[in-house]
Structures are given as structure tokens and as C-alpha cells.
């Protein structure tokens, strides 16, 4: 990447982040004014969502960034393998989340809210594999064109629901909508189905490569649990 392009790439990243942060701030302010209890339930779901995303990532993003930067592997093949593995971990994490929330005595509605938002975060962890390729190739402009409209549509939906007085179960769909759109746009930009060719041999090969990353994943999950308890 040329040095003169660095400010432009940084601008793409900051533009996407600031757009989402601004829309999220508006959403939380409106929700807090309507009902602090609703905001508290969303906060509980967000905590679970962060855990699901951490498990879905399993420390593979750093591995992807370094591998893509060195150009040691076929990027699309590796991306497909990692995406498939992350999806498997996401599904397992969601199943565990559903049973844990039941064991904790959450109401059925709150369990659904947690499931919706946690699924969204899990999809974010899966889609981050594609964004790692974008970052390694200096294509933050592609990342911005995916993240910004997804955030605006997803959180915008949530804002409309809050203003319209919709039940919390419908408001909670904002994250799932944002993440599904983001995943769909990423697959479209990739131009192929990343799950093609994914199988047991791919899982076994990646399991060896992810050993060190898995340790950091456990540490991050423990930190989130500790913060939740406090």
C-alpha cells in the first residue's frame, strides 16, 4: 500500500465507525427515554452477544490478517475454511446461550431478545473474516460500503420501532437485521459461496493453526464473564 493512501484508508475506517456510533447513540438515547428497563434488557442481550462473537471468532482474525498479508495461502480458499469453522462455533455458542438463559430463569421473551442480538453478533464474528481480507488488501473502501448501509438500515429500523412504540421483541431485531445485511453484502462482494469445499479436513487443518488464538479467546471470554458478574 502506498504511503499517500494511508490517510484515505484511515478515513474509510473512521467514517464507518463514526456513522455507526452516531446512529447507535441516537438509538440508545431514545430507548432510554422511553423505558430504562428496556434499555437494561438490551444491555443484558448485548453482553451475551459479545460472548457469542468472541467464541465465534476463536482467535482466527489475527491469523487471517497475518496470513493474508504474507500471501502464503489462497485467500478465498482460506476465507471459506475459516468462515465455515466460525459458523460452527457460532451455532454451538447460540445453543449454549439459549440453555444458559433458561437456566438463569430469564423470561421466554428475554431469551428470544438475547437470541436475536447474540445471533447478530455471531454473524459479525463470521463476517469479520471477509473484512480481514479487505484490510490486508488495503480495501477499506469496500468494508465501508458494506458496514455503513448495514448499520444505517439495521439501527434505523430500531429507531423507527422505538419512536413508533413497538414492543421490545421487535426492537431487538435491529441487530439481526444489521448483521444479516452485512453478511449478505459481504458474500455479494466476495462473488462466491465461501462454504463451497468446506469439510472435516479443513476443520482439522485449521484446528492446528488456531491453537494459540484459542487461548486468547478463553481469556477474553473470562474477562467478559468477570465484568458481567461485577
Functional labels for PLM-detected ranges:
Residues 3-4, 32-38, 50-87, 133-142:
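Transmembrane-helix boundary and interhelical linker motifs in polytopic inner-membrane proteins
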Residues 10, 14, 132, 136, ...:
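Conserved glycine-rich helix-kink/hinge and helix-boundary motifs of the Major Facilitator Superfamily
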Residues 29, 33-36, 62-66, 101-106, ...:
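Transmembrane helix-loop junctions in multipass membrane proteins, especially transporters and channels
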Residues 1-6, 141, 145, 168-169, ...:
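Interhelical loop/hinge segments that connect adjacent transmembrane helices in multipass membrane
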Residues 5-61, 94, 98, 120, ...:
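Signature of the first transmembrane helix
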Residues 111-118, 145-192, 208-212:
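Hydrophobic alpha-helical transmembrane segments
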